[in-house]
């Protein structure tokens, strides 16, 4: 139960109120299509790369199957979709999936993030303006404050807001009924969610890194939407270097487009041009960037390959430990170039080989 001011409790927030408006984005199917037709609108190109329907969403087959069944069942019963928690590394399509679900359900998707919901009236303002069956997407949901979480408990379970109006002896409890809605939460740290919040999600699904075949299809689709003529080898090269992440694939594709534009490349973009563009941005053949190599080289040069503690490495690199752990390390771990041990981080034999660093026995010799 949360304490809010009597003014906030007695008035239903209006979407057009300036100071009290909660920072969020409303995505509507018809408006989305209009934005895509007008490339002059902010975000038109960015949104145009996002798939709109489950059939267009490439990869994550098991996730699509589970959510597809849930959507069909909810539509068939005329109910709101059960609450969904999506977790996994950044850039794998959690926000896109929320927008796809809203499109499949034919409802409005309200997009916000946990850091934007600092005050109780922020989350209250969002919840009381939801229409029946609307989808509310909260990114970085693990960063919700305790008060915001407590407001969500009855809202998710009983479609009710429990508010305490006033203070001291004049305090009274007021319950506001909410329409049926779907909360879709996204997080890169599922373990950081409190158990009461996590247990209120009916569907908890993990997004996995993408395979090469799916990434090739994603790059081909994005190239078509950006009016780029990519050779098959060029497409494969981008897919190999994007760290199994569609967001990075689209970013690298745009950097290739920049180089092609400057080079006045009027024909098909080939593998050589892709290699030139990505080498310029210090992305090597396995997708490692400058941050990855700095971490591994620090371990090798200053710590003999490890082990070394995360805080020690972060201080030496001038990085935040959380950034190293959540952004840099996952892909190195996936490739088998890095190991996490109780004593710290260690560069593996595969990591040494990739950097051309001699093995310990060679150094001793």
From Swiss-Prot:
GO annotation, biological process: DNA recombination; DNA repair
Record region (Disordered): 1-48
Residue stretches of biased makeup (Basic and acidic residues): 13-23, 31-48
Gene Ontology cellular component list: cytoplasm; Holliday junction resolvase complex
Annotated ATP binding sites: 49-50, 91, 94-96, 200, 210, 247
Amino acids binding DNA: 340, 345
Region (Small ATPAse domain (RuvB-S)): 211-282
SMART domains: AAA (SM00382)
Subunit relationships: Homohexamer. Forms an RuvA(8)-RuvB(12)-Holliday junction (HJ) complex. HJ DNA is sandwiched between 2 RuvA tetramers; dsDNA enters through RuvA and exits via RuvB. An RuvB hexamer assembles on each DNA strand where it exits the tetramer. Each RuvB hexamer is contacted by two RuvA subunits (via domain III) on 2 adjacent RuvB subunits; this complex drives branch migration. In the full resolvosome a probable DNA-RuvA(4)-RuvB(12)-RuvC(2) complex forms which resolves the HJ.
Purpose of the protein: The RuvA-RuvB-RuvC complex processes Holliday junction (HJ) DNA during genetic recombination and DNA repair, while the RuvA-RuvB complex plays an important role in the rescue of blocked DNA replication forks via replication fork reversal (RFR). RuvA specifically binds to HJ cruciform DNA, conferring on it an open structure. The RuvB hexamer acts as an ATP-dependent pump, pulling dsDNA into and through the RuvAB complex. RuvB forms 2 homohexamers on either side of HJ DNA bound by 1 or 2 RuvA tetramers; 4 subunits per hexamer contact DNA at a time.
The protein's name: Holliday junction branch migration complex subunit RuvB
Natural source organism: Synechococcus sp. (strain WH7803)
């Amino acid at each position: 139960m949360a304490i809010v001011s009597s003014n906030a409790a007695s008035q239903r927030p209006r979407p057009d109120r300036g100071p009290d408006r909660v920072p969020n984005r409303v995505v509507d199917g018809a408006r989305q299509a209009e934005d895509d037709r007008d490339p002059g609108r902010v975000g038109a190109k960015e949104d145009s790369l996002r798939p709109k329907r489950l059939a267009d969403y490439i990869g994550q087959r098991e996730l699509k199957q589970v959510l597809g069944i849930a959507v069909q069942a909810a539509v068939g019963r005329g109910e709101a979709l059960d609450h969904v928690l999506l977790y996994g590394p950044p850039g794998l399509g959690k926000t896109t999936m929320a927008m796809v679900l809203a499109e499949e359900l034919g409802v409005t998707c309200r997009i916000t993030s946990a850091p934007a919901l600092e005050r109780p009236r922020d989350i209250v303002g969002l919840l009381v303006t939801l229409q029946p069956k609307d989808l509310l997407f909260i990114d970085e949901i693990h960063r919700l404050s305790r008060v915001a979480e407590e407001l969500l408990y009855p809202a998710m379970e009983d479609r009710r807001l429990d508010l305490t109006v006033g203070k001291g002896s004049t305090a009274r409890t007021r319950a506001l009924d909410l329409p049926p809605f779907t909360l879709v939460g996204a997080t890169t740290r599922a373990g950081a969610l409190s158990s009461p919040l996590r247990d209120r999600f009916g569907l908890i699904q993990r997004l996995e890194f993408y395979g090469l075949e799916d990434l090739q299809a994603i790059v081909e689709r994005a190239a078509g939407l950006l009016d780029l003529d990519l050779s098959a080898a060029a497409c494969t090269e981008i897919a190999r270097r994007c760290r199994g992440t569609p967001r990075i694939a689209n970013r690298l594709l745009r950097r290739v487009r920049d180089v092609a534009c400057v080079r006045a490349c009027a024909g098909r973009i080939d593998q050589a041009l892709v290699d030139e563009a990505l080498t310029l941005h210090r992305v090597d053949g396995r997708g490692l960037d400058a941050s990855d190599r700095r971490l591994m080289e620090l371990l090798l040069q200053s710590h003999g390959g490890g082990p070394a503690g995360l805080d020690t490495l972060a201080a030496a690199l001038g990085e935040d430990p959380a950034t190293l752990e959540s952004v840099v390390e996952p892909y190195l771990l996936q490739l088998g170039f890095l190991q996490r041990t109780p004593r710290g981080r260690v560069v593996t034999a595969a990591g040494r080989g990739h950097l051309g660093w001699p093995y310990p026995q060679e150094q001793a010799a």
